[in-house]
């Protein structure tokens, strides 16, 4: 079973610049291959699949050198996300893929775990090309790390969602005492420890009586 755990991160100035570049580059790659797949089908009746686009990505990075400044796996994931969007469209699970706009105030990219490129520490997380980023952990799961999705929300805050598989469920011991509940007539609820909750009807009468005094 796969499960994602979302944590807030606090990148420094240089890291924020790199994240902005990565958001922009992954959007560029997504839009580039969306246009290429659309044109190939409309002009020549050819359907370009993920493999064809992934191979072409190598040439695209040579043409646009600035693509090499960001995480290469994130660029591949952008191509994969586009392919997934097409698959969902053909299965009638979603609309035809749309171009990603620069004007959106929500950005994200996904990268995969490989050779220790992503690692979670006590107060930092290591991300490809970004380095060690300060993190506020919600919990430390036990499982096999698959990848990470880095995002920036409209408020300007940054988050990372770490995806794991084979996650161990943590069972917390009960720290409260068992309490029996009995419904009464005059008293609304009577707990086994003797505590009583007054019936709302009698409570209202009591309040009116106090107000008349």
Question: PLM features: what roles do these ranges have?
Answer:
Residues 1-213:
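Nucleic-acid substrate recognition interfaces
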């Amino acid at each position: 079973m796969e499960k994602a755990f979302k944590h807030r991160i606090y990148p420094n100035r240089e890291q924020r610049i790199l994240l902005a570049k990565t958001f922009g580059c992954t959007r560029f790659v997504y839009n580039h291959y969306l246009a290429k797949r659309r044109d190939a089908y409309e002009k020549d009746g050819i359907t370009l699949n993920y493999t064809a686009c992934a191979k072409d990505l190598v040439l695209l990075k040579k043409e646009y050198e600035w693509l090499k400044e960001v995480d290469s796996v994130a660029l591949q994931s952008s191509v994969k996300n586009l392919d997934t969007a097409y698959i969902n469209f053909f299965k009638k699970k979603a609309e035809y893929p749309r171009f990603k706009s620069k004007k959106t105030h929500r950005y994200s990219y996904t990268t995969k775990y490989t050779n220790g490129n992503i690692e979670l520490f006590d107060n930092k997380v290591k991300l490809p090309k970004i380095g060690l980023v300060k993190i506020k952990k919600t919990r430390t799961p036990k499982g096999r790390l698959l990848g990470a999705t880095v995002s920036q929300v409209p408020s300007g805050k940054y988050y990372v969602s770490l995806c794991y598989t084979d996650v161990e469920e943590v069972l917390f011991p009960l720290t409260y005492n068992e309490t029996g509940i009995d419904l009464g007539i005059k008293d609304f609820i009577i707990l086994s420890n003797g505590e009583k909750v007054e019936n709302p009807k009698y409570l209202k009468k009591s309040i009116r009586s106090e107000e008349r005094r």
